[in-house]
């Protein structure tokens, strides 16, 4: 969770810097949203990879299925 918080802070600092330096606000906002979504997706995949017997659901767009050795279930596309 600390890595996620640190990553979000870094993304926000970079986003604000890009916003100040850029002339076109529309493009900057699209890039900021894309970066934040990518960070959230990576954090979600890192934290919620195993899904069998867990109360935490898989990330959006993923489903719980048997893993490679079928001992555990993993969130996969």
From Swiss-Prot:
Which residues are annotated as pro-peptide in the record? 23-42
**Keywords associated with the record:** Disulfide bond, Ion channel impairing toxin, Knottin, Neurotoxin, Potassium channel impairing toxin, Secreted, Signal, Toxin, Voltage-gated potassium channel impairing toxin, Voltage-gated sodium channel impairing toxin
Its localization reads:
Secreted
Q: Which GO terms describe its cellular component?
A: extracellular region
Give the signal peptide range.
Answer: 1-22
UniProt similarity note: Belongs to the neurotoxin 02 (plectoxin) family. 04 (U16-lycotoxin) subfamily.
Protein purpose: Inhibits Kv11.1/KCNH2/ERG1, Kv1.1/KCNA1 and Kv1.3/KCNA3 voltage-gated potassium channels and Nav1.7/SCN9A voltage-gated sodium channels. In vivo, intracranial injection into mice causes lack of coordination for 10 minutes, followed by fast recovery.
Q: Which domain of life is it from?
A: Eukaryota
Cysteine pairs bridged by disulfides in the record: 44-59, 51-64, 58-75
Entry comment, domain topic: The presence of a 'disulfide through disulfide knot' structurally defines this protein as a knottin.
Chief location bin: secreted
Q: What is this protein called?
A: U11-hexatoxin-Mg1a
Q: In which tissues is it expressed?
A: Expressed by the venom gland.
């Amino acid at each position: 969770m600390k890595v996620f918080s640190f990553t979000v802070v870094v993304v926000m600092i970079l986003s604000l810097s890009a916003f100040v330096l850029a002339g076109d606000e529309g493009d900057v906002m699209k890039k900021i949203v894309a970066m934040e979504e990518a960070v959230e997706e990576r954090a979600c995949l890192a934290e919620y990879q195993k899904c069998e017997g867990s109360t935490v659901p898989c990330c959006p767009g993923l489903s719980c299925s048997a893993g490679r050795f079928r001992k555990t279930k993993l969130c996969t596309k």
